[in-house]
């Protein structure tokens, strides 16, 4: 665990509203977080983690237990976070279907709720015809917004994602401007 993990571990992070059906944030480590989600009428949690973080099996069991305790459906939609493993359109369509077919609100997260979560939300919003400028703006505002987000793997993953799904040159230029601003 690193110092930057402390706010995530103890639930001191925001739960961000994407739209009326979807909320986003980080993994659920504490009972207080799942209680906050229940209070926001969340009926489904979508976990994007692929098991790469230390302690993941225990944390996954804990999160599943919390969901069961609060009668919230827990769904795994594993997504690797590496530059050469950008999911195909089918993956994003399946996650979008999970959200759209849920009768209540869904909460989606990876470990920190930034990169993988941001990419899935970008594709969810793209499927809903949200303005591309807003999608890209949110991708940076909630995902790649700190110097540490632009280390090699994170930045290469972002570029690969943008080139594949949002290939307009202006989006790639914006990514480079954000990187220069923070690095």
Please provide the spans of the model-predicted regions.
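Cys-dependent protein tyrosine phosphatase-like superfamily
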Residues: 1-107, 112, 119-183
């Amino acid at each position: 665990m690193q110092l930057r993990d402390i706010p995530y571990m103890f639930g001191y992070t925001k739960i961000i509203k994407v739209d009326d059906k979807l909320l986003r944030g980080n993994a659920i480590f504490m009972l207080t977080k799942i209680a906050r989600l229940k209070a926001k009428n969340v009926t489904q949690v979508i976990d994007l983690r692929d098991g790469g973080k230390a302690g993941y099996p225990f944390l996954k069991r804990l999160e599943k237990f919390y969901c069961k305790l609060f009668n919230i459906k827990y769904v795994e939609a594993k997504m690797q976070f590496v530059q050469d493993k950008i999911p195909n359109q089918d993956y994003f369509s399946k996650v979008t279907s999970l959200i759209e077919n849920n009768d209540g609100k869904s909460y989606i997260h990876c470990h920190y709720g930034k990169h993988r979560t941001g990419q899935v939300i970008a594709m969810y919003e793209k499927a809903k015809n949200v303005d591309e400028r807003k999608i890209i703006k949110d991708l940076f505002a909630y995902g790649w917004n700190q110097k540490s987000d632009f280390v090699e793997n994170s930045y290469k993953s972002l570029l690969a994602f943008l080139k594949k799904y949002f290939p307009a040159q202006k989006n790639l230029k914006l990514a480079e401007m954000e990187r220069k601003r923070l690095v």
